[in-house]
Amino acid sequence: MFIQIFIQTLVVSLLLIIALIIIRKNCCPYYAFLFILAYLVSRIVVRLPYFFGLDLGLNYTWTGHFLMIIWVLVFVWIGPLKAKDIGLTLKQYPDSIIPAIKLTIGITVFKGIMAAILTGQPNDILVETFLFQITMPPLAQELVHTGLLLTLMIFALGDRINQKTDWNRIIYLAVIVTAFSHGIKFALSYNGGLQLSIMAFIIPFIGKVVYAWLRLYTGSLLFPILAFSISNFVVWLVPYLLN
């Protein structure tokens, strides 16, 4: 398991280096290092309960995701970033709510259609699956990827996040690297040998690109978390409607 995590981190590190080479001017290696450190720790933390008997006998990594949330809050507390830097605010940028609602509906419809095409029989773990999917992944993963990692990546490439953030090549590269760091978790595995699944990469990657846009456009993690939660609810519901 840890071999797989380190391989994924190495691949993400290589992509990060490429992004730094492309930008060059005003890049900050310190934030680049923090990006890799934060990514690696978040990947390890979510798996720790399995090794210390803290999984509570449940079917999903509740405690692991809770530890991810704690990890982000601790990082913000002791690190160079402020809560507002990573989108921990309910305040939305002016005139951003309606476009954010439209995009939330769009990603929900997209994931619902993909669920209808790709999903088989409904999961028998009805209540736990529902409760987990609408809470822990949206909260933990958006805090880590769309909040902490996206901000560190933008800072590493020499830009900052504010209401007038332009979608220049720094922002595009930061979004791509951050979304890639999420998608690779599902696409690249190691079980006696490396295995790569493009299909397992595409949907998580697209989702993180959309959530990154929501984060940067609104200035808050509120809509990314809501969009993730609502779309997960639809993905959970679709198999029951079709069977």
Feature roles, as predicted:
Residues 100-101, 228:
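Residue-level recognition of transmembrane alpha-helices
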